[in-house]
């Protein structure tokens, strides 16, 4: 049963991530009158929707009893403040990570950023080994290096996207490099820390998601105030929201649920493979649907490497020992 849940959750993650990337890109490029929706508010709304969905799932698990739901939420969240506070750590790190990536993109050319940020694949594996005592074989380590290289090639910017590296000073590039490296390590740690909490405590994945969403909403609202406070006060929190925006928000909320399920029934490393495959899929669909991307030979090379790495990670060489004779 757990194996079926593992592959089902990974398959849904590929579908969800691909759909989210395409709809988000389309929603941000669609030309409409009036102000565009703010991504910072969309993040907060997605967190709130995720909390609501998790409460409904806990309600369903409680045999649709409001009294049982109230007791579970009270016992598992309010009566266990230290357990709830544990989720403030990954939530805060994710917020820090988003800010670090903004700093990195402001101080690095696109190619350096994309290649360096793929180190998060290896940092996730390293934290999985050190924090969860996960054992990886030679083929699995090799597949992770191939995956990292493949994703870097797939996301390699086109000539029109590249910045002139001469315009960036050495000091600026150092700041950008330190920011992206810190983001890589924080991403790996936060993901594995959340996995450790999910797998080593008795609380359900839905309760943990409610706790994570609570802190995510708080940090998200802080982001809205800091980055888009003026725009919100001028045009409102839901400025620019339309049917497509709500689809994006719902897909983001679904992503939080699916990722938690993947981490619970699979692991962060397999999540990285699923996300990498969705990058290829969304890019190819974008080429045929949005027609805003032209695949290059570097992209196809990267796609081949990602697919090869995926199969290599699951390769389990059988020992060919000779039977001993009596």
Swiss-Prot record:
InterPro entries on file: Nuc_sug_transpt
Keywords: Golgi apparatus, Membrane, Sugar transport, Transmembrane, Transmembrane helix, Transport
Predominant cellular place of this UniProt entry's protein: Golgi
Topology versus the membrane: Multi-pass membrane protein
UniProt keyword Acetylation, yes or no: no
Subcellular compartments: Golgi apparatus membrane
UniProt GO MF annotations: UDP-galactose transmembrane transporter activity
Any one cellular-component term (Gene Ontology): Golgi membrane
Gene Ontology terms describing biological process: transmembrane transport; UDP-N-acetylglucosamine transmembrane transport
Residue intervals passing through the bilayer: 8-24, 42-58, 138-154, 174-190, 210-226, 247-263, 269-285, 296-312
Known function: Uridine diphosphate-N-acetylglucosamine (UDP-GlcNAc) transporter in the Golgi apparatus. May supply UDP-GlcNAc as substrate for Golgi-resident glycosyltransferases that generate branching of diantennary oligosaccharides.
Annotated PANTHER family: NUCLEOTIDE-SUGAR TRANSMEMBRANE TRANSPORTER (PTHR10231)
NCBIfam families on file: nst
Family indicated by similarity: Belongs to the nucleotide-sugar transporter family. SLC35A subfamily.
Quaternary structure and interacting proteins, as annotated: Interacts with SLC35A2; the interaction is reduced in the presence of SLC35A4. Found in a complex with SLC35A2 and SLC35A4.
Name under which the protein is recorded: UDP-N-acetylglucosamine transporter
